[in-house]
Regions:
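Short glycine-rich, Thr/Ser-proximal phosphate-binding strand/loop in the N-terminal lobe
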Residues: 8-44
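A short acidic Gly-Thr/Ser loop motif
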Residues: 11-16, 189-194, 211, 309, ...
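Phosphate/pyrophosphate-binding loops at sites that engage ATP/ADP/AMP, CoA/4′-phosphopantetheine
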Residues: 55-70, 177-180, 291-302
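Short beta-strand-loop/turn "lid" adjacent to the catalytic site in phosphate-handling enzymes
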Residues: 57, 62-107, 126-128, 134-145
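Glycine-rich phosphate-binding loop of actin/hexokinase-like ATP-binding domains
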Residues: 138-235
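Adenine-nucleotide phosphate-binding core of ATP-dependent small-molecule kinases
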Residues: 248, 252-261, 265-298
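Glycine-rich phosphate-binding loops at beta-strand->alpha-helix junctions
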Residues: 302-325
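Glycine-rich phosphate-binding/hydrolytic loop that grips phosphoryl groups
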Residues: 333, 337-374
Length: 374
């Protein structure tokens, strides 16, 4: 008797877009994107966007009907300390999830909206939330606590949560597969508009550059990254800035944009201005310092992996980063680096260097598949 195919829909619902992928028995058979939601060039609201997505899926020919979709996986940015693994959505879990929206006010409300709309539009499917923070839930206190009064953690949940976890988890698994599980100390570098680096030991993360929010860590496209905590206090007390103004500045007007007026790293590379060169060097320095600190934490490295827009797209940046780790025995093959091969380290290198495309959608699917098998 022929076994029924497993159809899983994966959704990433953002403030102005909905990205979807439909999987059939481990294969992505359909994908699409609705963007500019709420604007003149997009759908009026998220419900209409999702209705159109379901219509596209139903008319695609890859599925007999929407009821064949038994599971829907949702990317949710923040799981707080409550959700540490993929979670089946029921009334209680939905209520608990809503209680965490204050931790990620720019993301979680829209992730939750996607869940609620799917419960309404396709009630026969089971909905799972997969969390960006989940990968870091095994952190020990010395990894996630700040040097603040301990009661601030107990009262206000102030701690490092880490983000881009779905991407770092996927890249870690893929690296282990490619290197046949010989790499125990791995540093994964997700470098794009948002950038983060994670230290992996025996398949588990032990530190990551993003913190309580995705603002901490590296300089990014429009985010400032690490700054002295007294800077916002100074600007409020002495120059009349409000917390909301600083939130806007630190998240949307800093980073590459704030330093040289350019958002796109490709433009930063092209422009031969004093400020664009400064921006490049500052970003390079922040990446090198973070990788270097994780090498110390891991007491070495078996593999360094680059992914996302900058990590995959800029051979020059990879080369400039890796020059700083020649002392560790890192040697790259320049030809392989510029040809965008999977492994760009030379045969003589003591550390494997890889360039891999991330696939958060596939990771979410795999997480759900593992969950429903149990």
């Amino acid at each position: 008797m022929k076994k029924n195919s497993l159809f899983v829909l994966v959704l990433n619902c953002g403030s102005s877009s909905v990205k979807y992928s439909l999987f059939k028995d481990d294969q992505e058979v359909l994908k699409g994107l609705k963007e500019n939601i709420g604007l003149k060039t997009g759908e009026k609201n998220h419900q209409i966007a999702l209705e159109k997505i379901f219509e596209e899926i139903n008319n695609s020919g890859v599925i007999k009907g929407l009821k064949e979709i038994k599971y829907i996986g949702h990317r949710v940015v923040h799981g707080g300390e409550i959700f540490k693994k993929p979670t089946l959505i029921n009334k209680n879990n939905l209520k608990r999830l809503k209680s965490l929206s204050y931790l990620a006010p720019l993301h979680n409300p829209f992730n939750i909206l996607g869940i609620e709309l799917c419960l309404k539009l396709l009630p026969s499917a089971k909905n799972y939330a997969v969390f960006d923070t989940e990968f870091y839930s095994s952190f020990k206190e010395e990894s996630f606590l700040y040097g603040l009064p301990y009661e601030f953690y107990e009262k206000y949940s102030l701690r490092k949560y880490g983000f881009h976890g779905i991407s770092h988890q996927y890249i870690t698994r893929l690296t282990e597969k490619i290197l046949k599980h010989k790499a125990k100390k791995i540093i994964t570098c997700h470098l794009g508009a948002g950038s983060s680096i994670t230290a992996i030991l025996n398949g588990q993360p032990i530190d990551t550059s993003m913190g309580f929010t995705p603002l901490e860590g590296l300089i990014m496209e429009t985010r400032c990254g690490n700054i002295d905590p007294t800077i916002p206090l100074f600007l409020i007390k002495n120059h009349g800035f409000t917390p909301d103004q600083l939130d806007e500045i630190f998240n949307k007007k800093s980073g590459f944009l704030g330093i040289c007026g350019l958002r796109d790293f490709r433009d930063v590379l092209k422009m031969e201005t004093k400020k664009s060169k400064l921006c490049y060097e500052m970003y390079l320095r922040s990446v090198v310092k973070t990788i270097g600190s994780y090498i110390s934490l891991l007491n070495g490295a078996d593999a360094i992996v680059f992914t996302a827009g900058i990590g995959e797209g800029s051979a020059k940046f990879r080369e400039d980063v890796l020059k700083h780790f020649e002392y560790l025995g890192v040697k790259i093959d320049k030809k392989k680096n510029y040809q965008k091969k999977t492994i760009i380290s030379s045969n003589q290198s003591k550390v494997k260097v890889l360039v891999l495309p991330t696939n958060e959608t596939l990771m979410i699917y795999q997480e759900i598949k593992e969950k429903i098998k149990k």
